[in-house]
């Protein structure tokens, strides 16, 4: 059976760890070449080596809030691997606090990384993809953008905004052969979630009908689906990867 992403080139932001790294691993396993972007260059270089080194994975320092950084990231893929087939806008941060205690800076930081960062990645990737009349853009939203979470007015707003942006961009780009879809993960096992107090973890887990947290690899599988021709007639969709939480 042929690999789903054979000879395709993908750019993944937030690629040094977590979901971004898991997506990179799965993409390479499916035959893709990847360029990982992250603000932590050292960690990104380590991740690229884990994926197989320069022949299949490159590391670039990228602050997604800066359009010039994103442009360099994408152009690295074009120059080193000959094109851009898939863009995964995954970079993210959290600055959780109630509205009473959240600072304006904390709000702005989260909006800038998630929402502006995704906009930068989507528009700059589309500028390259339109030349070939094909491409797949995958944006990382969250269940938090669907239902809202206490202490996450910034994060929930940003993730909901990504849904609206995905749908608007899908309509703008469909005639160019560019598909734009989003993933909305729920409770996914990671260093961040495993650091939660046990009481909070148990509360969140109780909301999941499947009775367990998801694994990063399970989100990566959905990213492969949206990046590949398996989803060739899908654009503007948001796929929940939540184990049934908040259905």
From Swiss-Prot:
Its EC number is 1.-.-.-. NAD(+) binds at residues 19, 38, 63-64, 155, 159, 190. Substrate binds at residue 142. It comes from the Bacteria. The active site is at residue 155. One of its GO terms (biological process) is fatty acid elongation. GO terms for molecular function: oxidoreductase activity, acting on the CH-OH group of donors, NAD or NADP as acceptor. It is an enzyme of class 1 (oxidoreductase). Gene3D superfamilies: NAD(P)-binding Rossmann-like Domain. The keyword NAD applies. InterPro entries: NAD(P)-bd_dom_sf, Sc_DH/Rdtase_CS, SDR_fam. Pfam families: adh_short_C2. Belongs to the short-chain dehydrogenases/reductases (SDR) family. NCBIfam families: PRK05653.1-3, PRK07231.1, PRK12826.1-2. This is Uncharacterized oxidoreductase Mb1385. The lineage of its organism: Bacteria, Bacillati, Actinomycetota, Actinomycetes, Mycobacteriales.
């Amino acid at each position: 059976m042929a690999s789903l992403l054979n000879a395709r080139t993908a750019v993944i932001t937030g690629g040094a760890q977590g979901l971004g790294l898991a997506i990179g691993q799965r993409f390479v396993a499916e035959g893709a070449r990847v360029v990982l972007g992250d603000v932590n260059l050292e960690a990104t270089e380590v991740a690229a080596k884990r994926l197989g080194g320069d022949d299949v994975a490159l590391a670039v320092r990228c602050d997604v809030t800066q359009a010039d950084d994103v442009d360099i990231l994408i152009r690295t893929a074009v120059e080193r691997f000959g094109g851009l087939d898939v863009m995964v806008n995954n970079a993210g941060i959290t600055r959780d606090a109630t509205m009473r205690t959240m600072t304006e800076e904390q709000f702005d930081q989260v909006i800038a990384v998630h929402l502006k960062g995704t906009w930068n990645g989507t528009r700059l990737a589309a500028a390259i993809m339109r030349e070939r009349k094909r491409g797949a853009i995958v944006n990382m939203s969250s269940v938090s953008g669907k239902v809202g979470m206490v202490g996450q007015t910034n994060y929930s707003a940003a993730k909901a905004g990504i849904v609206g942006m995905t749908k608007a961009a899908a309509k703008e780009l469909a005639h160019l052969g560019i598909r734009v879809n989003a993933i909305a993960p729920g409770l996914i096992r990671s260093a961040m979630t495993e650091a939660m107090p046990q009481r909070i973890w148990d509360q969140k887990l109780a909301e999941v009908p499947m009775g367990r947290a998801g694994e990063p690899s399970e989100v990566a599988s959905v990213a492969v689906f949206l990046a590949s021709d398996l989803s060739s007639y899908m654009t503007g969709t948001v796929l929940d990867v939540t184990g049934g939480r908040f259905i």
